């Protein structure tokens, strides 16, 4: 896109005909969104809350306050008392600097972006199926494909330029077949050859049913699957339960339509599948997205012209957030469970590997809110996003972000709803006012160049974080500045080094090459100097154990697989078919809440309207939110078009006008764009007043398209309404103005929290582990020998006692350093010992011996649980000695459990199956077994 400038102001834009993505076309937001750049409401100066009110301040005042607060939180709570929540609308260079601030400077995992709300599932599904993030397909596949499969993707409203390419095909010679999955009769669905309209939350059942028909009709590409895919039989076993009749009962989709869609998919010569929020923000999001991947893999239609998968993005630069490791991933799509990958990051940043936070995946935003609620995060830095409109269950979010003890920094271009409750507001530059790169969903990277100066004292986000890094004096392991960059191009060149050898390798890209008139797809290497159009054309996937970004997850429980579990699948460069059964949504409809809620977008607005709501053309095109209701439900409720109604869920209520039609019966739709910055009355109107804070177990993406609501008529009477949903945002702003006063660091006694100094509980846990180990030595020495009369066991007990004593010896320096609290631990361990070893008298009963071994296994599990918790905690302390001690102890306890389990297996068949005791003796009042039964 080219920017028109006159007298230092943006005056218009035009599409660039030479560009490979848009071919010169622009959608409504592209054509008219630029108007917000010149809007009078732009933030132009930093603001600090003084005496309850946000007042103008200098950059030095604002940044000094932020740094002072960061130091205060560090000293009282550790670095883990600070959280970052960013955007999908900044540039690659800015995300990379922020990733370094958080992961290399503060060494914390508390970093996420609003990409969690829109594309976390896209990334997760590709990691599960292909071994790494990275879209297989290309936008050019639209021009070649014989079949388009759009699942939960209203492309006509969300990717208008891409949709224009689809319309070109549909209206041209040899149009492709179009299958659309959407409970609404959207503008996209109206063009479909087959429109499948399942009930909200039933995507897995529907997609399993389609796979069942591919299997049963022999439409699987057996040759491709046998050579390039693993997991076929597990998938076949699961989908065999999803016959068309079963699927119709679950989803409401007629059997005839299932057969029709499956036949088109099964017999097409090429297939481009896409997905978006109808999948990602719904029940079983990652499981559903993986089933879409499965369909292309089963047909062998991937990595070929016209054949691929686009797990779409929801924001212009969401891909870059993921690439740089600024949210839930690591830089360059590296695997946090792979020590080699962590070493690579550490080497590039020139820090010790222990300083790269990798004890778990980065903290997702809902968990950060939980930590804010608990009081363990006291500083929250928000950039380029507006959580007081965009997060689910808004009343809960308001309560948390307005806590007096929480220090909130918001960095944005306008005074958003979130900025209005913040302690410090930093004015940021937007596109056209700064230089940087961004990547499209099909891996095409563009360079966006600065055209005008930002208004007032606004700064590029990158420059704000570079200033913070300098003031915090972040250093590498040689004592040099950790983040020494002075320009976006310097950051980009540093990023090229980080990308080297990874799926997104950009080493042959440069600003000069990207300024050539069109974007370039990654990977861009010496082998592919002009980029690579589509991935997996050689059927080589990113699934080698040493290379993959993730070892995958159980799609139903969300539990991550270990390296050994992953290796057992033996993907070795092959794609992985991931299976999952359908599970009911946690909140179903009821008599009180009979309608299924779904939220989404309108073509003329974007996210929370921070920019589009300030474009006259876009705002006039869609000025107010509505609730879309089916004809049948409107008739049952006696509703008419335009009538105001109150919509209630278990969490809140809104008041909206009704629009009738084009949605499945039993469902309602509300656009999520609208908050309160330009509200003209006191109605609640934000869709997220209603939504639930439940997230997908794998991707941790919120399920905005879930939950149940009811509609109540809103009858007008003289002087007001009989039923009214009042907004609560204004009240939240007033509470901050009254309650926070001037934002400044807490005093030495704890500031807002009074005189009570918080105490960490690491010492309690360590003391409990130490005392548990001490008692385990006693169990090996005194208790088990009285209960298990077996020479082999007796000889092994001395080895077990020695192993435990060695762990205690290794643990002592760590205990001494951190001052473990022993009293609590000994009490708990003694209670546990008495509970699991109720029989303490000497016995020759083999059953008692077996029970004693089981009890020993339980006690070892107690020890193991303490070590499991201390493993990431020791890493979060960046204490290499502590990490090594815990790792060694875990190995020792695993050896002991293996020994115990083997003896249980040896003794159990003979003890449990062969009768040796008379019934009257078994239940005799004097027997220890009777004591167990009575207890």
Q: Where are the predicted features?
A:
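Conserved alpha-helical segments that form or flank metal/cofactor-binding pockets of metalloenzymes
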Residues: 791-831, 900-903
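Alpha-helical bundle segments that constitute or directly flank the non-heme di-iron/ferroxidase center
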Residues: 754-789, 850-877
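Extended redox/cofactor-interaction regions of prokaryotic respiratory oxidoreductases
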Residues: 96-167, 174-179, 204-208, 297-421, ...
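N-terminal leader/propeptide and maturation segments of large enzyme subunits in energy/redox metabolism
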Residues: 52-53, 212, 219-255, 334-357, ...
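Long, contiguous, secondary-structure-rich segments that constitute the structural scaffold
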Residues: 461-520, 608, 612-628, 632-742
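N-terminal export/assembly segments and adjacent metallocofactor-ligating motifs
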Residues: 1-217, 246, 254, 336-339, ...
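Carboxylate-rich helix-loop segments that flank metal/cofactor sites and access channels
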Residues: 121, 741-748, 813-855, 916-927
């Amino acid at each position: 896109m080219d920017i028109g400038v006159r007298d230092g102001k943006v005056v218009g834009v035009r599409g660039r005909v030479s560009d490979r993505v848009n071919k010169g076309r622009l959608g409504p937001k592209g054509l008219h969104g630029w108007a917000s750049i010149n809007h009078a409401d732009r933030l132009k100066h930093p603001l600090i809350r003084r005496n309850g009110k946000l007042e103008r301040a200098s950059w030095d005042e604002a940044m000094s306050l932020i740094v002072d607060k960061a130091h205060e939180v560090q000293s009282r709570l550790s670095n883990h008392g600070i959280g970052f929540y960013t955007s999908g609308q900044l540039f690659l260079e800015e995300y990379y600097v922020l990733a370094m601030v958080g992961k290399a400077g503060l060494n914390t995992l508390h970093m996420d972006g609003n990409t969690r709300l829109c594309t976390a599932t896209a990334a997760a599904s590709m990691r599960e199926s292909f071994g790494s993030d990275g879209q297989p397909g290309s936008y050019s596949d639209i021009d070649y494909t014989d079949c388009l499969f759009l699942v939960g993707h209203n492309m006509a409203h969300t990717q208008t330029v891409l949709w224009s390419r689809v319309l070109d095909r549909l209206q041209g010679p040899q149009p492709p077949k179009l299958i659309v999955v959407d409970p609404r009769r959207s503008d996209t669905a109206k063009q479909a050859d087959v429109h499948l309209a399942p009930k909200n939350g039933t995507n897995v059942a529907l997609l399993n049913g389609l796979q069942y028909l591919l299997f049963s009709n022999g439409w699987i590409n057996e040759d491709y699957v046998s050579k390039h895919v693993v997991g076929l039989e597990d998938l076949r076993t699961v989908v065999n339960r999803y016959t068309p009749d079963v699927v119709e009962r679950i989803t409401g989709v007629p059997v005839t339509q299932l057969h029709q869609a499956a036949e088109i998919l099964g017999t097409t010569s090429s297939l481009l599948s896409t997905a978006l929020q109808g999948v990602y923000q719904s029940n079983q999001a990652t499981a559903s997205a993986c089933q879409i991947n499965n369909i292309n893999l089963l047909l062998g239609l991937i990595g070929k012209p016209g054949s691929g998968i686009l797990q779409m993005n929801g924001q212009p630069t969401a891909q870059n957030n993921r690439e740089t490791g600024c949210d839930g991933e690591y830089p360059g799509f590296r695997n946090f469970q792979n020590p080699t990958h962590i070493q690579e990051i550490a080497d590039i940043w020139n820090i010790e590997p222990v300083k790269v936070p990798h004890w778990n995946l980065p903290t997702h935003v809902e968990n950060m809110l939980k930590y804010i609620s608990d009081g363990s995060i006291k500083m929250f830095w928000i950039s380029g996003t507006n959580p007081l409109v965009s997060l689910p269950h808004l009343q809960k979010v308001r309560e948390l972000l307005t806590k007096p003890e929480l220090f909130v920094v918001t960095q944005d271009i306008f005074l958003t709803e979130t900025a209005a409750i913040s302690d410090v507001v930093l004015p940021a530059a937007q596109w056209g006012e700064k230089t940087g790169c961004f990547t499209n969903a099909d891996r095409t990277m563009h360079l966006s160049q600065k055209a005008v100066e930002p208004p007032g004292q606004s700064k590029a986000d990158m420059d704000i974080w570079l200033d913070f890094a300098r003031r915090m004096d972040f250093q590498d392991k040689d004592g040099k500045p950790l983040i020494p960059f002075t320009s976006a191009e310097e950051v980009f060149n540093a990023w090229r080094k980080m990308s080297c050898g990874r799926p997104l390798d950009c080493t042959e890209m440069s600003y000069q090459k990207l300024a050539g008139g069109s974007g370039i797809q990654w990977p861009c290497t010496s082998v592919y100097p002009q980029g690579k159009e589509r991935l997996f054309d050689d059927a080589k996937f990113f699934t080698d154990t040493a290379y993959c970004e993730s070892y995958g997850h159980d799609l139903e429980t969300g539990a991550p697989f270990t390296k050994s579990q992953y290796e057992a699948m033996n993907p070795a460069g092959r794609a992985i078919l991931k299976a999952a059964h359908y599970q009911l949504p946690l909140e179903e409809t009821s008599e009180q809440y009979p309608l299924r809620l779904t939220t989404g977008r309108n073509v003329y607005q974007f996210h929370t309207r921070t920019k589009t709501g300030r474009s006259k053309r876009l705002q006039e095109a869609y000025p107010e939110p509505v609730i879309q209701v089916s004809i049948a439900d409107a008739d049952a409720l006696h509703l008419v078009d335009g009538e105001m109604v109150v919509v209630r869920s278990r969490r809140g209520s809104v008041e909206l006008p009704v629009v009738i039609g084009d949605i499945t019966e039993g469902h309602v739709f509300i656009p999520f764009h609208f908050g309160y910055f330009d509200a003209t009355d006191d109605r609640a109107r934000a869709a997220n007043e209603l939504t639930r804070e439940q997230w997908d177990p794998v991707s941790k993406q919120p399920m905005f398209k879930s939950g149940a609501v009811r509609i109540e008529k809103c009858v007008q009477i003289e002087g007001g309404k009989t039923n009214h949903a009042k907004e609560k945002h204004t009240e939240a702003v007033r509470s901050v103005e009254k309650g926070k006063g001037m934002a400044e660091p807490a005093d030495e006694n704890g500031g807002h929290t009074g005189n009570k100094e918080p105490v960490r509980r690491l010492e309690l846990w360590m003391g409990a582990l130490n005392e548990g180990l001490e008692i385990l030595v006693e169990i090996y020495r005194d208790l088990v020998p009285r209960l298990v009369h077996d020479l082999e066991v007796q000889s092994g007990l001395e080895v077990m006692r020695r192993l435990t004593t060695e762990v205690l010896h290794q643990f002592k320096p760590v205990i001494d350093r951190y001052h473990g609290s022993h009293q609590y631990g000994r009490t708990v361990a003694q209670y546990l010992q008495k509970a699991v070893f109720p029989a303490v008298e000497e016995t020759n009963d083999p059953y008692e011996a077996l029970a004693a071994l089981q009890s020993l296994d339980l006690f070892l599990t107690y020890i193991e649980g303490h070590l499991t918790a201390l493993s990431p905690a020791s890493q979060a302390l960046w204490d290499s000695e502590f990490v090594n001690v815990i790792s060694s102890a875990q190995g020792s306890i695993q050896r002991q459990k293996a020994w115990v389990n083997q003896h249980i297996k040896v003794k159990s068949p003979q003890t449990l199956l062969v009768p040796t005791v008379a019934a009257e003796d078994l239940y005799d009042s004097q027997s220890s077994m009777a004591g167990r039964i009575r207890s």
